[in-house]
């Protein structure tokens, strides 16, 4: 099913005054597509809109018709890697070319960033979504499972530190260590944006695991309502480790963080192309809640390789 270009809508920077409406459209669009009895309840008290706009207002775009917001899209940059979403349009304006018009400015932004890898996460069961993104050179590769497990509230002995505890004068050095570790996994991969956003907005914390002075794993975690996790949950938005053993320790540390904050559920994304990490998560009790597919531009592998110990999902 193709979008017909019935409306040529102005697309520009999403304004702070429009964030409440962007959030409403986001919930209504996804809730309607998924067939929820009350679509506006989609995602509960999790926040995917204001948090991303606050992290980088220049990477948030809105489509406007008769001066009213009808859709929005967000770009995220992790150093040499960029992805977009959530891309949502008010349901009364579906199939009229608005989603297509919200993708163009994002791709222009990717080009200005000079990133080497671009992608998105979408519904694996929707031919309409797959076809839309294929028109822009994105191709479906491996499934990504959004997995969760109950948090063990028992005593955790994993030794880890938190970014929030790093003295201000040492944070640049800490971010440099994070950059060095992720760059070794994929050239130019850099999570500074996410680490800073979580800290500045008080969305959770970043777990850091060290071997002496060498960083061996990190996990950027959203915790509770108002973050991308929602009530009673800790969501590992991005986690990476140098080895299988340090990956296990990272998952322990993230669970310990969740327990310390009184949260009952640990959530993380597992890409099937990273089968070793996927299998370790399954062995540890993670189970799939739902799954989508990552679409990558030029059909490139990126860091979704069997030798990488990463959790993320690009939602």
Question: Model-flagged regions — what are they?
Answer:
Residues 1-6, 15-32, 154-159, 168-182, ...:
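A short, well-structured alpha-helix characteristic of acyl/acetyltransferase catalytic modules
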Residues 2, 23-74, 186-206:
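Active-site rim helix/loop that mediates acceptor-substrate recognition in acyltransferases
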Residues 60-62, 67-76, 83-88, 208, ...:
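Conserved beta-strand in the GNAT
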Residues 84, 110-125, 260-271:
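Conserved GNAT acetyl-CoA-binding A-motif
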Residues 86-89, 95-112, 131-135, 244-257:
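Conserved acetyl-CoA-binding loop-helix of GNAT-fold acetyltransferases
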Residues 119-122, 139-152, 287-300:
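Conserved catalytic-core motifs of GNAT/GCN5-like acyltransferases
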Residues 129-134, 138, 279-283:
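Conserved active-site tyrosine of GNAT-family acetyltransferases
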Residues 135-235:
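Amide-forming acyltransferase catalytic core, primarily the GNAT-like/NAT-type
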